[in-house]
């Protein structure tokens, strides 16, 4: 008689975070676990708790290469500040395969903005807007980003227009 109890994602993530080679451990996971964004998010967060941000970033990038997840992309972006140029390059490689992914285009805009590449940021945000449907609630966030870009470019009038559009959408 064997009564196997499956560990929850948090427990498994804590165990996995102790491994020195996260990519090797990821590859060894069952396919269903590789696709489990809750597990991968918990694992990345456990790595962060152990002061292993670079390992968390590598794990998330590898997982995103393997299976796309907006949730993992958002977590990856939070860690992408250490080397913005490398992160921008990584996100651009994903965009080659996902050229109309509005969330990825927004991430590219955010990274370009952080890197002081205002024109590129503006272009990414505008392309992200075009990829969204007319009623998409994410438009408010993109308008907010565009307002920040125009503010950085010194065009306060345009910045205000975008900030007002963002506010208008956010209140409806």
Regions found by a protein language model. Give the residues of each.
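Repeat-based scaffolding regions
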Residues: 1-172
